[in-house]
Design a protein with these regions (language model features):
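N-terminal leader/propeptide and maturation segments of large enzyme subunits in energy/redox metabolism
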Residues: 75-84, 88-105, 312-314, 321-370
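An anion/pyrophosphate-binding glycine-rich loop and adjacent beta-alpha core
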Residues: 225, 233-352
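Short, well-ordered coil/turn residues at beta-beta hairpins
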Residues: 7, 190, 196-197, 277, ...
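Conserved N-terminal/central alpha/beta ligand/cofactor-binding core
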Residues: 31-161, 274, 281, 287
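Helical element adjacent to the flavin cofactor pocket in flavoenzyme catalytic cores
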Residues: 139-191
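N-terminal Rossmann-like FAD-binding beta1-loop-alpha1 element of flavoenzymes
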Residues: 3-27
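Glycine-rich loop(s) and the adjacent beta-strand/alpha-helix scaffold that form part
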Residues: 188-255, 453, 462, 466
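A glycine-rich dinucleotide-binding beta-alpha-beta segment and adjacent secondary-structure elements
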Residues: 170, 352-443, 447
Length: 472
């Protein structure tokens, strides 16, 4: 048994190590050089939506199903309450969150983390960048970098062959079965191909085609995303794979565009005012806890002219305990002693910005400010409103940070089943082809936070187990 894995992030490395542990010959094909490999995983803190090492968070299933797709045909939805074996081809290939797959995701999450623990990783409930939270998050000690380095060494110890600086170009097929891979350094034949090579956040043409022309204002959240150019998705679609996930969307994160750090996130906007290039507010900065709502706020930033906004706070930001943990940029705030002076430094229309701030301050009311919980301290008579933590911003000095939407990963990918087998447009598994991580599509509308790394580990492992005949 020869298993070919494309990509070396958490999905690819989980697949490669699992396959090698079953006794398979394994080849990993990776575009990046050694030491630069690992895709997005290398740069992420790798939050995991778990309430313990063995159980997913209480809201795991509910959040996925609340963002399960578009307006699905009720007849197809009714099919999905039956046993998966009784689904029609239409139901099997439908673009939506597959409840059977979601059940497998939740069921295998704990055992996958225990397997990663056996491989040498350690996990704990460590502090996050979120000042206010709704759900629980487990983290690997050392973040995604520890995952990449630990699993790479484990793979090498098991005899896995790595072909770095090698790009996958196309799938090889015979008699409707995938038999190998065409690469930039020649063909590789095998019994199964596992596509774990990310989404298309590093491909401007695909972003413009699917997300839209304004995607020129998006950039990958970290260096690893630039390597994810969508070939894995494209080559599978070319042989009839069914698409899944929202191709027109992506996981949005608010970052400081001046910074070259990985994930230079700005999560402190609930305590200030967001304005666009016209010097106007455009969204509720604080609809709820920041971990649950930052993505929707960031999407509103992306919709503004040139996809940029500025967060403005005043000296009372220091009333928020440890607010700096929500500001991951290495760039200093822009400071001024008046709103007029700040407008000049930000190159914003001073009259408009002064009017915006005056209207906002006038709409703030007296009340208890509780920065570590939803306090209901809301503006009155202001459109758009601010639902929590609304205090006047009128105490110099004033501080500002630019914010854009980063593209953490794209939502569109391939339809897979609970074993990570790629499904074709007729609802059948394509023999010899699997997908995991970003290359598989499961997200619609709003991202179910802290599940992408977990998705990669779970379905990378499930793909390898099935390909090796060891299905759990």
């Amino acid at each position: 048994m020869h298993v070919i894995v494309v990509g070396s992030g958490i999905a690819g490395l989980s697949a490669a190590l699992t396959a090698a542990q079953t006794g398979a010959q394994v080849t990993v094909v990776e575009r990046a050089s050694e030491g630069e490999h690992g895709g997005n995983t290398r740069y992420t803190e790798a939050y995991l939506r778990m309430k313990s090492m063995d159980e997913v968070a209480d809201d795991f299933i509910d959040h996925f199903m609340a963002n399960a797709g578009g307006y699905t045909d009720p007849g197809i939805e009714q099919e999905m309450v039956r046993d998966h074996a009784d689904w029609s081809p239409l139901a099997r290939s439908q673009s939506m969150v597959d409840p059977d797959l979601l059940g497998a995701f939740a069921d295998h999450a704990g055992s996958t983390l225990r397997w990663l623990e056996q491989a040498g990783l350690r996990f704990d409930f460590l502090p996050t960048a979120f000042i206010t939270t709704t759900t629980t998050r487990l983290l690997p000690i050392g973040g995604g970098l520890a995952m990449v380095e630990t699993l790479t060494q484990a793979c090498k110890a098991c005899g896995v062959t790595f072909r770095f600086e090698t790009t996958a170009r196309a799938l090889l097929t015979r008699d409707n079965r995938v038999t190998g891979l065409a690469t930039s350094n020649g063909d590789v034949s095998g019994d199964a191909v596992i596509l774990a090579c990310g989404g298309f956040e590093g491909n401007p043409e695909m972003l413009a085609r699917y997300v839209g022309a304004p995607a020129i204002n998006l950039r990958p959240v970290a260096r690893g995303g630039h390597y994810n150019k969508g070939e894995g998705i494209r080559m599978a679609l070319d042989i009839g794979a069914a698409p899944n996930g929202d191709f027109g969307s992506y996981h949005a994160e608010p970052i400081d565009p001046r910074s070259g750090l990985a994930e230079p996130a700005i999560f402190t906007f609930p305590y200030g005012v967001l304005v666009n290039k016209q010097g106007q507010r455009f969204t509720d900065e604080a609809p709820g806890t920041v971990d649950a709502h930052y993505e929707n706020v960031t999407r509103r930033i992306y919709e503004q002219r040139d996809g940029i906004a500025w967060l403005i706070v005043d000296a009372r930001i220091d009333d928020v305990p440890n607010w700096q943990k929500g500001s991951r940029t290495d760039q200093p705030p822009i400071k001024a002693d008046s709103i007029e002076a700040l407008a000049e430094k930000l190159d914003l229309p001073a009259d408009a910005l002064c009017e915006t701030m005056a209207r906002y301050n006038a709409a703030c009311v007296e009340g208890a400010f509780k920065p570590l919980e939803k306090d209901g301290l809301a503006t009155q008579g202001l459109t758009p409103p601010k639902s929590h933590w609304a205090r006047p911003v009128d105490c110099a000095p004033f501080l500002a940070w630019p914010i854009i939407s980063a593209n953490v990963f794209t939502f569109g990918g391939l339809k897979v089943d609970r074993h990570a087998r790629v499904i074709d447009q007729d609802g059948r598994a394509i023999p010899g082809l699997y997908a995991a991580g970003e290359t598989m599509g499961i997200y619609y509308r709003t991202y179910t936070g802290s599940t992408s790394v977990l998705r990669g580990a779970v379905f990378g492992r499930q793909a390898a187990l099935h390909a090796s005949g060891r299905t759990q």
